[in-house]
Amino acid sequence: MSNHHAVVKTQAELAELFAQDLTCGVGRSVKHDSAAKHVSGEAQYIDDRLEFPNQLHLYARMSDRAHARILSIDTAPCYAFDGVRIAITHEDVPGLKDIGPLMPGDPLLAIDTVQFVGQVVLAVAARDLETARKAAMAAVIEYEDLEPVLDVVEAFRNKHFVLDSHTHQRGDSAGALATAKHRIQGTLHIGGQEHFYLETQISSVMPTEDGGMIVYCSTQNPTEVQKLVAEVLDVSMNKIVVDMRRMGGGFGGKETQAASPACLCAVVARLTGQPTKMRLPRVEDMLMTGKRHPFYIEYDVGFDDTGRLHGINLELAGNCGCSPDLSNSIVDRAMFHADNSYYLGDATVNGHRCKTNTASNTAYRGFGGPQGMVAIEEVMDAIARHLGLDPLAVRKVNYYGKTERNVTHYYQTVEHNMLEEMTAELEASSQYAERREAIRLYNAHSPILKKGLALTPVKFGISFTASFLNQAGALIHIYTDGSIHLNHGGTEMGQGLNTKVAQVVAEVFQVDIDRVQITATNTDKVPNTSPTAASSGADLNGKAAQNAAETIKQRLVEFASRKYDVSEADVEFHNGHVRVRDQILTFESLIQQAYFAQVSLSSTGFYKTPKIFYDRSQARGRPFYYFAFGAACCEVIVDTLTGEYKMLRTDILHDVGASLNPAIDIGQVEGGFIQGMGWLTMEELVWNNKGKLMTNGPASYKIPAVADMPLDLRVKLVENRKNPEDTVFHSKAVGEPPFMLGIASWCAIKDAVASVGEYRHQPRIDAPATPERVLWGCEQMRQLQAAKAVEAETEMASL
């Protein structure tokens, strides 16, 4: 029989332990709580769970038409397959038939028409997935084809929108453009991006005895899944519990898109009384779900001899797909970030929500911000080529100031501006000036291989643009042995959120992080959660957990003060111990004393972000609590005969405030940069003329591999610079801002191609800059050079 009695330590021994620093609190590089499980395969995902007895497997039959009227659906052939339990259409949904997250437009099962190739028309549940698939494909669906809209430019020109356009305006941009010394116009196409999470969309639903459901779902938004499942079943939300331990990746793709499998499973489970599971194969996942919004950009800019902007008109046309989904907020954020780090002067920024017959596009890391930033970075490069200046010089002359030229085009003051200092530090550490000169010399003597260099900044606003989402809850229990149980409303998708929130709680109580146990996110423990998105996971949930921990800690301080007849200031927590004036207790002994004194050792916590507001009718406000800053310097080499390129070196300096966990934050910066680089260089989505996505698997859709990383990648976090706002331990969000660092790679490729034209012409290279587009850009430069040579010869001949 084991001995559970702890060894009693002397006061001297306790004092020595008390004096030591906590090794796993805030600011420490604590290992990700599931790191070992991830690499060993022990981490449990939904598909790893033991199957329930009598569990059904669900397969969705998707539309093969981009736009058509449904004339008839015959599911009778489905039942010819042994093992089929049920086939459902929209007529079988007991409650609400539309699962649009904020407004209607997303029927769970197609009703009268189909709007894109991949829309779910019917679903079949059977004893195994293969039987369900064969049966679903046997159903007979008759269509009458309708004319689809597949091109975002066509939708933009014809004002074919899912929602009304929105405008940010400051000053008289038309007047500024008319009087500017220099004026250029241009267009740009920015491609979308597949989330390509390792774990595809999946849900498993278990009916309960009281008519409710337990939903195991890979989702960034458990409360929304809970709400929508309740609505399609026509029951109250308290009948539905959503359980989410971890996702195998999300990137925004499981913010709204996870609801469809969960709701389909719930309908089948309600109709059959049997547990039901749906896991999308990769091809079906890519066809059925939305992507990052592609954008079409038109710009008209006026500027002076230094490249400083005087006026700008920007048209941002987002391809929203067939329904609103989150597009209103996504296009808004593109507009909010169409300045990136630059004072635009007199500005008009129009955001358009274009409707096409493709899958409804959705949230993706950056949430529209990257597309807005790419637009203005294209403008900066175009100005530099027009004037024959270094693009970095043009960028710096347009930076926001600290006391003037410091208000955005939506009237938020840019506070705590770090752009100049960070750029200067990165310029020096990356040896930008020396390398710029060396690259110009190299290119002058290298006719085929050309090098490019770019240094681009990032200023990214942190907060949900939908203000009501800026709230979070948490629940903490302390047990009598001193162990701590933590639940919060955030979801873990590999980004280390659970580790960071556990560090926050460990820091408050000054205990080892091993004492803190985090379990699955459950809607019956922390209700009304916001999605884990907008880089807000640690900001919101960390603050809520801190609030809950501080509440319990204050009770303990008050108890110790009364019990030992000391002031509250005499009670100090440190390194797993509590000093009460001259006496030192272990943390667990104080907990036991408090329990016997009937002190509550449990608390909820809550947090809402202060200061933020946005008046949409006036198009002005403070939509962001603060800005996160960053800068990246990329060097690339391009083969101008093939368009192929290689990233040679990348230097990154990124601002995370007082880092909660430097190791995790550096990992997020590295991963964000690579994902952003992939979006702008190789990740190309291609649809055929019938509206079918052809790049629908890893064989045709290319994401960055190890070999695509820069040969030399150097990442540094800004040191000794706390977030001046009252965030969790004065940290800053790190999920999305590093993604935009990848813009430097695209700009470096354009810089290399521009060297073919002696840096005086802006190459037309839409994003992603695939080798084909890079080659076209090189040919464009060669043709311009050839035309210039002919013009020079003609002029000489005329003399």
Where are these regions (language model features)?
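Phosphate/diphosphate-binding loops
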Residues: 127, 274-320, 543-572, 576
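Flexible, low-hydrophobicity surface segments
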Residues: 1-165, 183-186, 271
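Thiamine diphosphate
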Residues: 248-273, 277-279, 497-505
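Short beta-strand elements
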Residues: 43, 202-207, 296-305, 311-316, ...
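Extended active-site and interfacial segments that coordinate phosphate-rich ligands
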Residues: 33-37, 58, 137-144, 150, ...
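Glycine-rich loop/linker segments at domain edges
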Residues: 28, 33-41, 166-203, 294-379, ...
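Helix-loop-helix junctions that connect adjacent transmembrane helices in secondary transporters/permeases
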Residues: 153-233, 399-483, 694-708, 712-716
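C-terminal catalytic domains of large/alpha subunits in multi-subunit enzymes
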Residues: 4-7, 90-91, 234-239, 269-276, ...
